[in-house]
Every structure is written in C-alpha cells, then in structure tokens.
Amino acid sequence: MLDITDITKQFPAVRALDGVSLEVESGEVHGVIGENGAGKSTLMKILAGDVAPDEGRLLVDGEATRFGSPREAIDAGVVLIHQELSLADNLDVGANILLGREPRTGPFLRRAEATSRATAAL
C-alpha cells in the first residue's frame, strides 16, 4: 500500500502542492487529472523519486520512506508511467515493458523470467 499524507512542495515562485493526501492499495492503478498548474506532475515526480517533498509523510507498506531516486521508488514497487510514453523502437514489446527492470543474474538476462513477467503484464 502507498499512503501519502499532507505532502507539500514549494518552488521559488509557487506552492505546487499544499497538503495533498492519497492512498493507493497494492495492485491498484490510478490516473491523476486536473488543470494546468494543479501540481499533478510535481506529485508524480515525488512518488517517482525525482523530487523530494518539503513536508508530509510517505508510507510504502506501512513504512515511512523518502525516495532519493527513481531506482529507489521502482525497487519499492512504485512505478510511474509518463504521459509522454517513449518506446525504444529497436526493442520488442516485452523488452519495452521491462526496460530498466530486467531480471538479471550479474550481467546476464534471465530470459525465461523476463518473458514470463512481460507476458503477465500484458
């Protein structure tokens, strides 16, 4: 479960988020909509580990956390699918799905597991 409470983010000219709260159960998929400047992108960047909140609490499975990087968010199971979806034209569908999260043992790709995970995602 992902639980954010009273998240606030201030930039020099604007308060982008002011006490935002959201709860997402494991396995749920949510879309965020709103007017330009409403703070959607800032909230997503905080959840994805791109930006740190100024205030508020972020819990993943009941444990307080602050993501220092997108890799930390992904490792915690928080994945952001950007609105401007960019695919690697030279990769197949499965490779695009797992891009950056390929199952590996050292430098070697575990192909059977990769195929299984990509198929499950479809």
Language model segments and positions:
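Glycine-rich phosphate-binding loops of nucleotide-dependent enzymes
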Residues: 1-122
